[in-house]
Amino acid sequence: MEGKLFIFSAPSGSGKTTVVQHLLNTDPRIGFSISACTREMRESKEANGKDYYFLSVDEFERRIQNNEFVEWEEVYPGRYYGTLRSEVQRIWDMGKHVIFDVDVKGGLSLKEQFGDKALSVFVKVPSIEELQKRLIDRNTESEDSLKARLEKMKYESSFQDQFDVILVNDRLEETFVKAHQLIDHFLENNSK
């Protein structure tokens, strides 16, 4: 089966990962695309092949040369993230549609690759003030980090109109319902 793809992208703190996890836990038709990266694994919190495929820089670059990635990006020097073609195929081989939780750049790249087979969704917070509150409530950001994330959010938000749908995450339960409706509608109208 060559299924459909659901691309969820957003600035940090938008609730994108929470929405994607909810969809994965409640919709058996979809499977999660695990990204590959070159950063160090957080030993106590992450597992290779579950959270990410952790690759060395040399291995990642070799796979780039072999055209094994659907999309990839060097986010910092020597720090790569990407989506392996084999990962998309793995999910399709299970008879499922693929869901992605990726940054804005990756989301646009995936949409460009897959075109009408993919629905790209930009998850948006109602306001910058709300995003700032969410990031502060996480209690994981220094003041400089918070400032940098807010600047990045403004930049990433400038691309929101390039996505098929903008999903405003104001009330989480309502956002879950809307996300399910988006998937159902896309599958019903793109069943070819």
Curated annotation (Swiss-Prot):
It is an enzyme of class 2 (transferase). The keyword Nucleotide-binding applies. It is found in: Cytoplasm. Disulfide bonds: none annotated. GO terms for molecular function: ATP binding; guanylate kinase activity. ATP binds at residues 10-17. The keyword Methyltransferase does not apply. GO terms for cellular component: cytosol. InterPro entries: GK/Ca_channel_bsu, Guanylate_kin-like_dom, Guanylate_kinase, P-loop_NTPase. Keywords: ATP-binding, Cytoplasm, Kinase, Nucleotide-binding, Transferase. Its EC number is 2.7.4.8. It catalyses: GMP + ATP = GDP + ADP. Belongs to the guanylate kinase family. Essential for recycling GMP and indirectly, cGMP. This is Guanylate kinase. It comes from Cytophaga hutchinsonii (strain ATCC 33406 / DSM 1761 / CIP 103989 / NBRC 15051 / NCIMB 9469 / D465).
